[in-house]
Amino acid sequence: MKLICTEDAVGSVLCHDLTQIIKGVTKDAVFRKGHVVQPEDIPVLLSIGKEHLYVWEADESMLHENDAARILCDICKNTMMDESPVKEGKIELAAAADGLLKVDGTRLRLVNSFGQMMIATRHGNTPVKKGDKLCGTRIIPLLIEKEKMQRVRELCGDEPLLQLLPYKIKKAAVLATGSEVFHGRIKDTFTPVLEEKLAEFNVEVVYKQVLDDKPEQITAAIKTAIEEKGAEMVLCTGGMSVDPDDRTPLAIKNTGARIVSYGAPVLPGAMFLLSYYGEKQVPVLGLPGCVMYAKRTVFDLVLPRVLACDIVTADELAALGEGGLCLNCAVCTYPACGFGKGW
């Protein structure tokens, strides 16, 4: 690569895309990498402020930005992602299907600390739809040493930095608890809310019951849902507070399920319970009343991970404290907001 005056560039091969920016009109490459400069191009180049140009001068020890972006893209990409054509030295990845985005933050920081290169991603543990943008990759200079890119590739290993996990759970049970609902004193308005949320992920409710605040009944219903009705996840509503009549946490514990956490540093949703039942680790969740009336709660944060069979730990739930406060915005933009970005 060498630098020459634009007026002297006729017949030279451009090393990179040249971008024209007109506010509110366009931001695109007016000439692409590999273009052979023609006499009529000179006025156009000068009009976009290019009085000097980098033109190609072969050097086998260096990689062009487009080729380096391809390496960074390969470091990130898994099988459920589509890549954009390289443009202005940048490649972007988009979701090829709905799923849960996972980001290896440790290795991502390694790449971005290496110098002269960058990968920018969405937050990990974010639910995404088909076509959603996931990341962008490029190097900072126009050229970079081949050896440097090879070292980065070797350090990152064979596992992609990004994973897009499909939603595997398709069948759920909803157990509404509470004497007031069981005896018909009030209508069960919790179950329809959960059915609507589950439908967003194409999850079918295969078993639903309204139960009294009797631990033995709730325990039996959880086991029936899993062992007889084929539920791959059980949602228990109500009975999650410290009131003497609220017995749902005890009922879940009595199934023998492994309790991950009773309580979460998230508002709304502090009285949330997460557990896993049996060898297949079927998720059994205790949902506080806020899930019924608040637009977004801890349930919305945990649900995509549960559906993707991505086991949640107590430490990860604890990490939700930073960013765990929903601001209850007048217009909700979740997940395109700061809520739940702590893990």
Residue ranges and their predicted role:
Residues 1-88:
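Short, low-complexity N-terminal leaders and the immediately following helix N-cap/first helix
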Residues 7-11, 29, 83-86, 126-128, ...:
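Solvent-exposed alpha-helices and their adjacent loops that cap or buttress functional pockets
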Residues 29, 85, 100-119, 126-129, ...:
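C-terminal terminal segments
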Residues 32, 38, 43, 123, ...:
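Residue-level recognition of short, solvent-exposed, well-ordered loop/turn junctions
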Residues 55-56, 81-86, 144-146, 204-208, ...:
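Flexible, glycine/charged-enriched surface loops at secondary-structure junctions
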Residues 59-167:
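Extended, charged alpha/beta regions that create polyanion-binding interfaces
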Residues 158-213, 217:
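Glycine-rich phosphate/diphosphate-binding loop of Rossmann-like nucleotide-binding domains
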Residues 179, 206-339:
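Short glycine/threonine-rich loop/turn motifs
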